[in-house]
Curated annotation (Swiss-Prot):
Residues 88-147 bind DNA. Its main location: nucleus. Gene3D superfamilies: Homeodomain-like. It holds the Pfam family Homeodomain. GO terms for molecular function: DNA binding. Forms a heterodimer with ALPHA2. The gene is MATA1. InterPro entries: HD, Homeodomain-like_sf. This is Mating-type protein A1. PROSITE patterns: HOMEOBOX_2. Mating type proteins are sequence specific DNA-binding proteins that act as master switches in yeast differentiation by controlling gene expression in a cell type-specific fashion. Transcriptional corepressor that acts in conjunction with ALPHA2 to repress transcription of haploid-specific genes. Required for induction of sporulation in diploid cells.
Amino acid sequence: MPSRTPTDIWRCQRLILAARKGETTCQALHEQSIEISSSLKWFEEISEWMSKFPESGLYISTTIWTFLEGVPNEHRIKYDRLIRHYITYIQQLVPARLVTAYLDSLFKICSHPTRTERRIIGEHCGISLHQVTQWFTNRRFREPKTDSPDDGSTRFIPSPMTSPGSIDECSFPESP
């Protein structure tokens, strides 16, 4: 009998979770696809909004660029490079946070996406399939475990050897 791949195990987990919730798999997948498409629309709107900043020249009116108007040309080149470097850093930093927020919203919908879903997510975010897989793996690891019945305290069950009065009742094997 062939061994189960992780994808098969995740499908089984999805079926079990859907059965526990009292919904069919088709309903669960349909609801997931609606939530994923709505979050994708949000991500595209935010990405479009963020892409306007470097091209449209909106940053020219900021105080940094106003400050550069009074600087002589020989010094302005140095400041210009530094500010462009800083703006590029901010532009790279903000989309990374948007990607994290987007992936986090998708994690709330489905913590075990299929390979096809991960590939699509990677294409939308501009990251590789491996990065998406690693992100979901790390996020699942950080997720608090809810399976334990108690608050994490370990129980000690004494063995017959350590319980009081058990020395007399124990029988030791004879040495050869």
